Amino acid sequence: MEELQGYLKIDRSRERDFLYPLLFQEYIYALAHDHGLNKSILYEPMENLGYDKKYSLIIVKRLITRMYQQKHLIIFTNDSNPNFFFGHNKNLDYQMISEGVAVIVELPFSLRLVSSPESKEIDKSMTTLRSIHSIFPFLEDKLLHLNHVLDILIPYPIHLELLVQTLRSWIQDAPFLHLLRFFLYKYHNWNSLITQKTKMILFFSKENQRFFLFLYNFHVYESESIFVFLRKQSYHLRSTSSRAFLDRTHFYRKIEHFLVDFRNDFHTILWLFKDPFIQYFRFQGKSILSSKGTPLLMKKWKYYLVNLWECHFYFWSQPDRIHINQLSNHFIDFLGYLSSVRPTPSAVRSQMLEKSFIIDIVIKKFDTIVPIIPLIGSLAKAKFCNFSGHPISKPAWADSSDSDIIDRFGRICRNLSHYYSGSSKKKSLYRIKYILRLSCARTLARKHKSTVRSFLKRLGSEFLEEFLMEEEQVLSFILPRISYFSKRLYKERIWYFDIIRINDLTNLS
């Protein structure tokens, strides 16, 4: 953010944000490349031209010069069905502009959040909050005292024009808003895509992820704004969002702050739902609202959320996108884990003088398990096994060297072990490892035109053990008495604070 401020030199005292002139500044496209979420399309032309993967100002200048030439930017205004052509390499030019627009449109939000008094305090606690695993200890501490959950799918806007109208409250630059409309209508088929019940994020264009991720995150930001009153009612709410919005998948910032102004009549209505034990958490398009309240209160929440989203935000939220469940007999599908709160009965012996008593008590336990069926489906989509879980070879990797094949399978196995180290039961994880191990063996046997049995008999099975036991070897350096710990590894849960993105195989499920 310091780099953005240094480049742009924006006067924060101005009440209005005029962003359109920034489109003609070359450094904006440099920032779009340097601060991109994913590998930029600029990497490919630089490789073809013999450059390395660093930013090249010469390439940016050439692209901007070509975009300024009329013969490469033709707009047919008299045609009843206008089409836009961006020269011979329209995809590259179009992505350059869209990435620049994405950087510019984030500025009003980022600068306001940086200028907030809470930002410095939040930066101090960013180290552990970056990890996805950091949310599970929080859930274990809070959900044990709650009764019901609302499984909510984030609603979608009726029309993408509503996103532009909502942005008008943040950006008062009319030419820039017209440019946003241009990009939205370029993807006119979005209105049919976002009405699907599948994950909205899957429809993002691979070439313009930053632009559409911003729109999606702004949409989620608005839909979550109804929970701002809870921070004023109870300190128990720990809802988080990111500095430049949360769902960048590689999310790198989280803050505990909402910057949304509410109408006075909202407070009167929302006060009826005062609940000091309510908890809210979200990832991508799915959110969970848990409470200690009665089923009647949860039904009120469901009715109120649907009506508020539809009537005040014009978001299309069907009632079947919100489900009421009881925590004691429900699994929460969140971040690739199946989490649950299970009552565990136990007996306690109490002795007073010469008499003893046995007291039966019930203790709630927070469990997290690996969803085996969705993971097998993901492995099947990636061609590691069939949908029944039977391992198959990976023909696409058969041309690689033996060490490269083993390294690829080992990396997948280690990443899965690392991500699902917080599972209460490791049996499902061991089955996934078994599938990957046999798939690796079948791939090597296919390469050497041999059977799996004869191949393992000739080379021995030890060469496949190293990447399957990586997690246990790491733990031996961290925890003492590893021989004792290895016996309990099946039941122990370990959360890591260096995981900043969900596992790729989990995203496929």
From Swiss-Prot:
Molecular function, one GO term: RNA binding
Subcellular location: Plastid, Chloroplast
Keywords: Chloroplast, mRNA processing, Plastid, RNA-binding, tRNA processing
Keyword Chloroplast: yes
GO cellular component: chloroplast
Keyword Plastid: yes
Pfam family, one: MatK_N
InterPro entries linked to this entry: Domain_X (IPR024937), Maturase_MatK (IPR002866), Maturase_MatK_N (IPR024942)
Top-level lineage group: Eukaryota
Gene Ontology biological process: mRNA processing; RNA splicing; tRNA processing
Similarity comment text for this entry: Belongs to the intron maturase 2 family. MatK subfamily.
Described function: Usually encoded in the trnK tRNA gene intron. Probably assists in splicing its own and other chloroplast group II introns.
Protein name: Maturase K
Phylogenetic classification of the source organism: Eukaryota, Viridiplantae, Streptophyta, Embryophyta, Tracheophyta
